[in-house]
C-alpha cells in the first residue's frame, strides 16, 4: 500500500507473559525487518471534521438521510449517526421503516436541540447552560448519547443551591438520573435544609415529598424547632387543602427533642395543634418525656425520641471588611481543616463597623461606616456563587451596631448614626423583604455586642453617648412581648467587647473602658442571671470579631489601643484556656464582621 511515497508494513504484536508471538501482514517479510507500527491520534478527528463539512447545508454531499424535527431539517450520514447513537443504530439497522426512508421525523425533540446533538455526534463538542440543560438532558437520553446526559447531570450538580435543589431533585427523579437525584436530596436534606425550608420550592412540595425530607435521620438542623417551623409553614401555605395532613407530618417531628419552654410557649399555643386531637397526643408524649428523670428517658423509644445524626459539613470562618487602618472592602476566609486564609469576593463598597450575621445560607453585612459616612445599606453574600448583592436598606444609618438572628428575623441593634448613639432597634423580615422597628432599648448603645440565647436577644455593654460613659449594663429582648428589660450587670464596663454564644452562655471578651483596653473575659448564664470571670485572653483586644464553632469561641483581630491586630485566638471552656491559631490574617483588622459559613463544595 503506497501512502505519501512511503511503503508501510503493519505488524501486530500480542504479548502474553514473557512470550511474544509475531504475526505479519506481509508474507514476504522476514524476521530481520522489524517493520513500523503507527497510530494517528488526529486521524479520526480529521475524518469527522471532513464528514461534518460534507453535511453542511452549503454542500450536503454523500448525505443519505434528512432528519426532521418541527421546522428544522438536518442532513446527515446514517453510518455516522448509527456509530455514535444506539438509538439511530437500532433505527437504521433494524426492520423499521426509517431504515430505508430518506426523510426521518424525530418526535419529542425540538429542532434546535436535535441540531445541537447531531453537531455533537460529528464534532464531540457541546455547550451546556442554564438555558438549554432542561431540554438537552431528556433529548440526550432519548438518543442514548450517555456522555451528553452525564455532562448535563454534572452541570446541574454544580448549580445546586437552596433555591433550586428541590426542583433539580424532581427533574432528576423524572429522568431517572439516580446519582444526581441522590446528590440533590443530600444537598436539600443533609446539607442545607434550614435554608431550603424558607424557599418557594419547599412550599410547593407534595405531602409525600415533605415527609421524605423531614423524616430523614440525617436532616441538618441546629434544633428540632426548625423542623416544627417548616411543617407549620408548609401547612399554612395552603391551609385549606393541607390541614388534614397535619397528623401525618407530626409523626416525623421529634417533639420530645424540643426544649420544655418551646413546647409550652410555642407548640402548645399553635392553633394548628390546639384544634387537632391527634396532634395533642404527640405533644402529651413529648411532655411525658420531659417529666421523666434524665436517666430514665431512654426507656421511651420511638422514632420521635431518636436524635438526628446529620452529616457535618466543613466550615470556614469569614471576616468581612473592617479598618486596616481605613475602611476596606476585602473579605477573607479561614479554613479550619487546612489552617489557611484565602480571599473571596470583595464587598461592593468599603465597609467597617458593620453588623455581620449568617442567615438562611447567606452572610449579611448590615450598616457600618464607609470611610466618610455612616450607612444604612445592607449587602448579602452568596457563598455558592461567591457574589455580593443588595437588599433594602435599614430605616436608620447605623455604625458600631450589633446584629443577630432571632427566629426568622435579622435584628439591627443600637449603633451610632454620626451624631448620637441609638437605642432604636429594627428587624428585617426576608419574606416581606422589609425592615420594621421593634421596641427600643432602655439605653442608647453604640459599640454594642449582641447574642441570642434560648430565644432571647441580649445587648451587652457599649457606649452611652448621653452620659459619655462605657457601659456595664446588659438588656434582654423578648420577641413575644416585644419588650426590653435589664438583667445583671457585667463586673466591668465594656465598650467594643466581642460578644459570642457558646453552649447556651453569653461571652463578653475584651473591649475597653475609656483608654483602658481589656483582655479579661466574663460569661453570663441566663438560667442563674449571673456573670462569672474566665481565663484572660492572650492579648488586650477591643472591636474584635467573635464566632463559635466546634465547642470553641474564636476572637478575631481587633485593636489593642495602638495598632490593629491580625492574630486570632480561641477559648476552650473545658480547659479554661486561650490559644492562638497558627496562622494570622493577611493584615490587621479592627471593626470587622465575622461569621461561620459552610465551606463551598
Curated annotation (Swiss-Prot):
GO biological process, one term: protein K48-linked ubiquitination
Pfam families linked: BACK, BTB, Kelch_1
Positions of the BACK domain: 165-268
Metabolic or biological pathway: Protein modification; protein ubiquitination
BTB domain location: 63-130
Molecular function GO terms recorded: actin binding; ubiquitin-like ligase-substrate adaptor activity
Domain of life: Eukaryota
Keywords for the protein's UniProt record, in alphabetical order: Actin-binding, Cytoplasm, Cytoskeleton, Kelch repeat, Repeat, Ubl conjugation pathway
Compartment annotation: Cytoplasm, Cytoskeleton; Cytoplasm, Cytosol
Kelch repeats: 316-361, 362-408, 410-455, 456-504, 505-551, 553-599
Principal location: cytoplasm
Gene3D superfamilies: 1.25.40.420, Kelch-type beta propeller, Potassium Channel Kv1.1, Chain A
CC annotations in GO: Cul3-RING ubiquitin ligase complex; cytoplasm; cytoskeleton; cytosol
Task performed by this protein: Substrate-specific adapter of a BCR (BTB-CUL3-RBX1) E3 ubiquitin ligase complex that acts as a regulator of ion transport in the distal nephron. The BCR(KLHL3) complex acts by mediating ubiquitination and degradation of WNK1 and WNK4, two activators of Na-Cl cotransporter SLC12A3/NCC in distal convoluted tubule cells of kidney, thereby regulating NaCl reabsorption.
Family the entry assigns: Belongs to the KLHL3 family.
Assembly with partners or alone: Component of the BCR(KLHL3) E3 ubiquitin ligase complex, at least composed of cul3 and klhl3 and rbx1.
Protein name per its UniProtKB record: Kelch-like protein 3
Organism of origin: Danio rerio (Zebrafish)
Name of encoding gene: klhl3
